[in-house]
Amino acid sequence: MTEPAFFPETATSTAEPRLVVEPGVAARVAAIAEPVLEGLGYRLVRIKISGEAGCTVQIMAERPDGTMLIDDCEAVSKALSPVMDVADPIQRAYRLEISSPGIDRPLVRQSDFERYTGHLVKIEMAAPHEGRKRFRGTLQGIEDNLVRITRDDAKSHEGAQPADARLPLADIASAHLVLTDQLIAESMRRGRDAEREQLENAGVLPPPPPHAKKAREMRDKAGPRKEKTAKKPLPKNTKAHRLAADAKRRQTTSDPHQGE
């Protein structure tokens, strides 16, 4: 199995702080896991501890580009398991689970809100903003530490365009992407690019030519592709169609000796 490559050029990206902080035992696990992940070139996304069917400690991680392959999960598990055994943050038996953020992933860093501009999100505020705590809409990026979304659940006034909301980044309690066809297609493309890059780094595939690498970078910066709208079929039962059909019927039923 191919070993995932270390990403030395992304050390700054891995050090970007998260906007969420887990409470209690999850916070202790995060304090142990985060340095190990950063040392391998990954970023911590979220810690979740559940007691169903025994205790499970789920550590959600990612590469700085937002992807996470199976080989990456295995590498993190192999490096983190002995560290967790020594630190022993949980005073009972547990199962360690390393996973990717998933397609409808949580947004936990400022760069997440920038990377997924153009996608549908759900946001919950720590305190009410403009009389409400929950928002849903299309992410429009960040400006002056305010997350901008175009809401799809409200209108500024009847007959107008959907209302915009500007939410303070520091007041966001949780945020995650909403599963759409557009998001699925984008995630699959990112996954294919990550797998190809892994094989290129391992020497299994030849490196891409400079123009192909540049095109890939420009495509990532461009954000999600706009869905193509199918052209509506032309109507086939208009007045012109009916008149033409009627004239054709009159020609076929007319007397062939007429005019002689």
From Swiss-Prot:
GO CC field: cytosol
Protein name (Swiss-Prot/TrEMBL): Ribosome maturation factor RimP
Annotated InterPro entries: Ribosome_maturation_RimP, RimP_C, RimP_C_sf, RimP_N, RimP_N_sf
A Pfam family annotated for this UniProt entry: RimP_N
Keyword match Membrane: no
Ranges where the record places region Disordered: 189-260
PANTHER family named in the record: RIBOSOME MATURATION FACTOR RIMP (PTHR33867:SF1)
S-S bonds: none
